[in-house]
């Protein structure tokens, strides 16, 4: 399956810019820059939306839902309904606490794994069978099992200067993985995306 709509999950207010939870937004911004696609607010689609041509001549649509994370599925459904896209043609990019920094995971299907944005996407697409690319944001250093406040402040916190350098390399790698999935299909891209660890630049 070749994705036709790529969605990055995040929260819309400026205070959430550059936070770990908004790495999905940052990924779509990186794709838009790489492919020269301009994103603009689209009320019908409840998000920032743009379309253009990705490498290989593939027509692609990009979306950043502006509904807040736990209602992301509304915006995704608005686009898929309008363009009559199947759920399987949607690639969703989002943050994952359980993956360390520098790791990414591309899968063809699966559960939400506790991620509210993905819960909403699954509910509105009425299927778990759509590809997703998870970007590792790591766990909080002082996490205690069951301490939700530590997790929330970590997820909604910003990357350190060193982490920001690493994440810019991760986003370059994400662009590479997505381009591979558009040219050769998600299955082929999974081997590359899931086997590599992006290393921090040597100081």
From Swiss-Prot:
Site (Stabilizes the basic form of H active site to accept a proton): 95
Protein family per UniProt: Belongs to the PTH family.
The protein's role, per its UniProt record: Hydrolyzes ribosome-free peptidyl-tRNAs (with 1 or more amino acids incorporated), which drop off the ribosome during protein synthesis, or as a result of ribosome stalling. Catalyzes the release of premature peptidyl moieties from peptidyl-tRNA molecules trapped in stalled 50S ribosomal subunits, and thus maintains levels of free tRNAs and 50S ribosomes.
Description of how the protein assembles with itself and partners: Monomer.
Pfam families in the record: Pept_tRNA_hydro
Protein name: Peptidyl-tRNA hydrolase
Provenance organism: Nostoc sp. (strain PCC 7120 / SAG 25.82 / UTEX 2576)
One function term, GO molecular function aspect: tRNA binding
Gene assigned in the entry: pth
Keyword Metal-binding recorded: no
Alphabetized HAMAP family for the sequence: Pept_tRNA_hydro_bact
